[in-house]
């Protein structure tokens, strides 16, 4: 199924846990004190891990063949200070754009831009993650 531009996933909670922030910072080999302590802030790419917390079926389905799926680009925009430990955000995906381009080895590559909005408990938009997904062209002869 190819969900249209504007299609949305189901909202899910993102609990910003201090320990998870510290684990993420350690994985980045960061010693920045902003990522430690009770009021730790999230590193800029921390929200990527929220995809792992989404319940099954909550993420918007762009309908691409996972055997030919590439993650082309990722961008984060913060609308104010970064989230802090103890916050509970509500996340929801939406398809912002779809387009096609000819593949360099033939066939057509399909693209989908998915924006994940992260909102504070009062509904304020805190951050957005913008991801460009690419479905490569099928190989000649129909093999994935």
Residue ranges and their predicted role:
Residues 73, 78-144:
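HotDog/MaoC-like acyl-thioester-processing domains
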Residues 1-73, 142-144:
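Hot-dog-fold acyl-thioester-processing enzymes
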């Amino acid at each position: 199924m190819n969900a249209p531009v504007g299609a949305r996933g189901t909202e899910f909670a993102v609990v910003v846990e201090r320990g998870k922030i510290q684990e993420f910072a350690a994985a980045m080999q960061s010693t920045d004190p902003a990522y430690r302590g009770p009021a730790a802030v999230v590193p800029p790419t921390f929200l990527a891990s929220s995809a792992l917390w989404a319940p099954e079926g909550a993420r918007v389905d762009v309908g691409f063949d996972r055997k030919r799926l590439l993650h082309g680009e990722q961008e984060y925009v913060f609308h104010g200070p970064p989230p802090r430990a103890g916050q509970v955000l509500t996340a929801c995906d939406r398809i912002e754009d779809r387009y096609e381009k000819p593949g360099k080895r033939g066939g057509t590559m399909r693209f989908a831009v998915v924006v994940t909005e992260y909102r504070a408990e009062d509904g304020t938009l805190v951050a957005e993650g913008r991801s460009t997904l690419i479905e490569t062209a099928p190989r000649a002869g129909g093999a994935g």
